[in-house]
Amino acid sequence: MNDKLQTTNYKLKIAWLYPELMSTYGDRGNIIVLQKIAEDNGIEAEIVRINQTSNSELLTSCNLIFMGGAQDLQQEIVNKDLLENKGSILKKMIDEETPGLYICGAFQFLGNYYKDAYGTKIKGLGVFDMYTESYKNKPRLIGNCVISPTKPYREAASTAYTLNAKPFLVGFENHGGRTFLSDKSQAFATVEKGYGNNGEDKTEGIHYKNSIGTYLHGPILPSNPELAVYLLQLAYEKK
């Protein structure tokens, strides 16, 4: 895969969920890259900013979804809005294979639950079959990360960068929560360097239908533009 999309000219709507609250570690750079690559390929890309006051139906008009990470307070605000308002629509779109990229806290929201270091359990949307827990006696997982994506992404990914003859992606992780997948075969990638979902089982992220959840900041798409191409191609094919 290169930076060229196999498309004809068309319009694309990219949903940016909670841009004021969920954009830590430069995650807005992912939106910039998606829009730039789309426009370089003759695609008119409209960024649709979705926040707490947005009509939930606005989300359904979009072809691609992005949500970044946040600090704990901002995550509480967003999680409340998702559970009470937009979550059912988001879940339906993901289940119906609308492509999406969900970073760190956004990735955690889509699991079954998040348990903080004090034992408080926060309900998730239950889109991804996984859970996340934080522990008082365990450190945050911080540092550069190198991952080898698993199928189905690997077959479509660029082979321009290799590590031990495997395609790989790079990014930066910084998370206190440790995520455990019910089915490890759904992992987005295998960790080559760093911690990944939990620092134990070498899984990183999740690949569910056309959605990718990951702990990789960087931001991830400027560091790995072939992933942006992959998501945009999925959006075109789904449209």
Task: Give the role of each language-model region.
Residues 18-20, 176-178, 218-220:
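Glycine-rich beta-alpha junction loops
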Residues 118-204:
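Pocket-forming structural segment of enzyme catalytic cores
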Residues 198-236:
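A glycine-centered loop/beta-turn motif at secondary-structure junctions
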